[in-house]
């Protein structure tokens, strides 16, 4: 059994779509990044790679590579799944937290879960996604960015 911890953060900017968990969420700002800047999926990828001792997403999908410009993070997550499976690991479970003042994530979590479970070929009870705010504190509380944490267990 191996545990992995992932974290990601992206700045909120105008003229970008807000994509979290593979879901496009209606909002006046989106996350800035080389790919689609999906903080939740990025945190999950880092947790999985960390648990398998395979580095991080920057090692496998560098932002200097034009092939990853605006790419769907779910596509990258599928590649991470292949990497950890190649090493002989399988996912036992993943638990995630999205930290955002706005927009409210509650209404989108089921769709996020469906996207990620489909991508990773997980049963619904193997993935948990929750969301919280920082009560107006810090960069997420001031709506300057959104972050996500993920922890996973591999066998």
UniProtKB/Swiss-Prot annotation:
Pfam families: YgbB. Its cofactor is a divalent metal cation. Disulfide bonds: none annotated. It catalyses: 4-CDP-2-C-methyl-D-erythritol 2-phosphate = 2-C-methyl-D-erythritol 2,4-cyclic diphosphate + CMP. The record marks 34, 133 as: Transition state stabilizer. One of its GO terms (molecular function) is 2-C-methyl-D-erythritol 2,4-cyclodiphosphate synthase activity. The keyword tRNA processing does not apply. It is an enzyme of class 4 (lyase). Keywords: Isoprene biosynthesis, Lyase, Metal-binding. One of its GO terms (biological process) is terpenoid biosynthetic process. It comes from the Bacteria. Pathway: Isoprenoid biosynthesis; isopentenyl diphosphate biosynthesis via DXP pathway; isopentenyl diphosphate from 1-deoxy-D-xylulose 5-phosphate: step 4/6. Signal peptide: none annotated. 4-CDP-2-C-methyl-D-erythritol 2-phosphate binds at residues 8-10, 34-35, 56-58, 61-65, 100-106, 132-135, 139, 142. Binds 1 divalent metal cation per subunit. Its EC number is 4.6.1.12. A divalent metal cation binds at residues 8, 10, 42. Homotrimer. Belongs to the IspF family. Involved in the biosynthesis of isopentenyl diphosphate (IPP) and dimethylallyl diphosphate (DMAPP), two major building blocks of isoprenoid compounds. Catalyzes the conversion of 4-diphosphocytidyl-2-C-methyl-D-erythritol 2-phosphate (CDP-ME2P) to 2-C-methyl-D-erythritol 2,4-cyclodiphosphate (ME-CPP) with a corresponding release of cytidine 5-monophosphate (CMP). This is 2-C-methyl-D-erythritol 2,4-cyclodiphosphate synthase. It comes from Clostridium botulinum (strain Hall / ATCC 3502 / NCTC 13319 / Type A). The gene is ispF.
């Amino acid at each position: 059994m191996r545990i992995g911890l992932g974290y990601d953060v992206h700045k909120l900017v105008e003229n970008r779509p807000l994509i979290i968990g593979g879901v496009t969420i209606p909002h006046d700002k989106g996350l800035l990044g080389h790919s689609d800047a999906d903080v939740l999926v990025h945190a999950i990828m880092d947790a999985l790679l960390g648990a398998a001792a395979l580095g991080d997403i920057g090692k496998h999908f560098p932002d200097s590579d034009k092939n990853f410009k605006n790419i769907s993070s779910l596509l990258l997550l599928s590649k991470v799944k292949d990497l950890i499976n190649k090493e002989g690991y399988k996912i036992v479970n993943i638990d995630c937290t999205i930290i955002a003042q706005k927009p409210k994530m509650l209404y989108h979590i089921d769709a996020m879960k469906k996207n990620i479970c489909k991508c990773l070929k997980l049963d619904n009870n193997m993935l948990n996604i929750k969301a919280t705010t920082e009560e107006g504190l810090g960069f997420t509380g001031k709506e300057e960015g959104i972050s996500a944490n993920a922890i996973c267990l591999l066998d």
